[in-house]
Amino acid sequence: DIPHKWSWVRLGELFQHNTGKALNSSNTSGTKMQYITTSNMYWDRFELTHLKEMVFTDSEVVKCTVKKGDLLVCEGGDIGRSAIWCFDYPMRIQNHIHRLRPYTTISVKFYYYIFFLYKQTGLIGGKGIGIQGLSSNALHKLLFPLPPLSEQYRIVEAIETVFAQLDSILTSVS
């Protein structure tokens, strides 16, 4: 159950969704550009020291480019692993990454934490109980809570306060 001021919504009501480009050695038209794969993505961060390159046409650049504030979600591997693109420059993505771009003002960080919750509870990527892969169709079937915007921000602040306290405790004992 959720509070009465909240509602349940499907992903497509909150985010415009695309996946990246599949690597195809026969595709040689376009411009060679760097892109990220699931191996560059970790929970809440990116490792960008070893980027791959492939050729992108102009239309693929539009479809496969992420910009600051986009929520990226892994389709396979560590299914549901998510991070928010926080850089001031665009980047392309390969096909095993979902790009979620909000239609309107929402706390993208709140939905990052929802993906973290869904992963930790086995709703996605679980052992036989949740969604095993995160295809576009599977992603679109997921329900997400939609609290008022002020509550989204308050919840994120509370989560980050607790995580900061945990980090402080871990630092003091190590």
Located regions from the model:
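Long, hydrophobic alpha/beta structural blocks
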Residues: 142-145
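Short, flexible loop/turn elements at secondary-structure junctions
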Residues: 4-6, 15, 40, 77, ...
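A short beta-sheet element
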Residues: 37-38, 54-119, 125-128, 133-135, ...
